[in-house]
């Protein structure tokens, strides 16, 4: 398995995780990001996932190459200092061009499975967003989550009235999930920063949202 590397130093690697690949094996096994760990480092104290992405989310994934680096990264995430940027294509689109969603999220389960729901009893969750472009029945959003809840971007977009294109849990679920972990920055010494290119399955939808930069992976 070959996963592109977006950033590397002695402490960290930032991978360009492909959509559809889980970060670790499920109960039934199968391929995962962890399969390439031996090729990243042979140290006894690493590598480690510094955070997680949903299997169907593409883009920046930070891997710590040693335990001390893992603790640094975890502290940055816990303190809300990690700067994360997501690109998403959503169904419809918000009326405004920018805003902030401040809506706590609670995990709920039923016979169909589990999901996150906006609920006052949930954990605090805040996501800033802006519209980068609009197309016919879709919109391209840039989102900056200020907290790190499970499914936060997906659940917040649904709460905004515009679920992600291809989201089987919070939207219609037709086609592939259009969500990219576009960029990440950890303000460490030295900093860790990377930007992921647009995956092939998102290019047409982003181009339809009127931005020529979308098809080349530019900003």
Residue ranges, per PLM feature:
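Thr-Gly-centered strand-to-loop micro-motif
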Residues: 24, 141, 165-167
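RNA pseudouridine synthases
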Residues: 1-126, 133-135, 178, 183, ...
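Loop/turn elements at beta-strand to alpha-helix junctions within RNA-recognition modules
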Residues: 67, 146-147
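Short histidine-centered loop motifs in beta-beta connectors
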Residues: 136-144
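Surface-exposed loop and edge beta-strand positions of immunoglobulin-like domains
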Residues: 51, 144-146
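Phosphate/ribose-recognition catalytic cores of enzymes acting on nucleotide-derived substrates
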Residues: 157-197, 219
């Amino acid at each position: 398995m070959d996963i592109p590397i977006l950033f590397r130093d002695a402490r960290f690697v930032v991978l360009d995780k492909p959509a559809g690949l889980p970060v670790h094996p499920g109960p039934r096994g199968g391929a995962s990001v962890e399969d390439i760990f031996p090729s990243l480092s042979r140290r006894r104290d690493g590598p480690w996932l510094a955070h997680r992405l949903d299997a169907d989310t593409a883009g920046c994934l930070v891997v710590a190459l040693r335990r001390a680096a893992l603790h640094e990264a975890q502290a940055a995430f816990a303190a809300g200092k990690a700067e994360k940027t997501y690109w998403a294509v959503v169904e419809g689109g918000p009326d405004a061009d920018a805003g902030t969603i401040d809506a706590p999220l609670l995990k709920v389960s039923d016979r169909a499975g589990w999901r996150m729901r906006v609920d006052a009893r949930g954990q605090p969750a805040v996501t800033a967003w802006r519209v980068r472009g609009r197309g016919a029945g879709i919109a391209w959003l840039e989102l900056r989550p200020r907290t790190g809840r499970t499914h936060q971007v997906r659940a917040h977009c649904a709460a905004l009235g515009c679920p992600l294109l291809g989201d089987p849990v919070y939207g219609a679920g037709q086609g592939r999930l259009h969500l990219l972990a576009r960029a990440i920055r950890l303000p460490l010494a030295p900093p860790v920063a990377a930007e992921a290119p647009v995956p092939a399955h998102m290019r047409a939808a982003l181009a339809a949202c009127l931005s020529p930069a979308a098809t080349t992976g530019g900003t």
